């Protein structure tokens, strides 16, 4: 499949997903006023740099930046997967990292557009990782 997509397209796609995800969480937090839980903060720590790093790599046509995209996306995906496990109840609540005074990692506020935010995050990180790999493997146009 990587022969069907160019380095430019793959890197641009990864950057668009990272940028859209970053803007979406800012919208959820700043416009909708929903405070992020602890796990959301950690996912943001992986997503925000992706928008910058992949954007600069695209601007400078540095396709090697895809390796940083893969690393950051896999780190964020691991946290999103853990978050999704807590949200769905697969992981026991006793290992829940959220504090008693802050927002919950598992309540109904963790839904956006009818889908759990941890699932949306996992999908975004997965797409970024796949597209970043394609940007490393694909032919240049």
Per-region residue spans from a language model:
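Secretory/periplasmic and organellar redox-cofactor proteins
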Residues: 1-39, 46-141
């Amino acid at each position: 499949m990587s022969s069907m997509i160019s380095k430019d397209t793959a890197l641009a796609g990864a950057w668009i997903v990272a940028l859209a995800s970053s803007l979406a969480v800012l919208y959820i937090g700043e416009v909708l006023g929903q405070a992020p839980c602890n796990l959301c903060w950690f996912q943001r720590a992986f997503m925000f740099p992706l928008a910058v790093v992949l954007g600069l790599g695209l601007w400078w046509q540095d396709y090697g930046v895809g390796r940083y995209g893969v690393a950051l996306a896999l780190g964020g995906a691991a946290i999103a997967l853990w978050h999704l496990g807590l949200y769905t109840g697969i992981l026991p609540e006793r290992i829940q990292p959220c504090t008693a005074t802050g927002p919950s990692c598992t309540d109904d506020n963790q839904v956006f557009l009818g889908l759990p935010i941890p699932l949306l995050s996992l999908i975004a990180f997965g797409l970024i990782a796949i597209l970043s790999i394609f940007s490393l493997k694909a032919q240049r146009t």
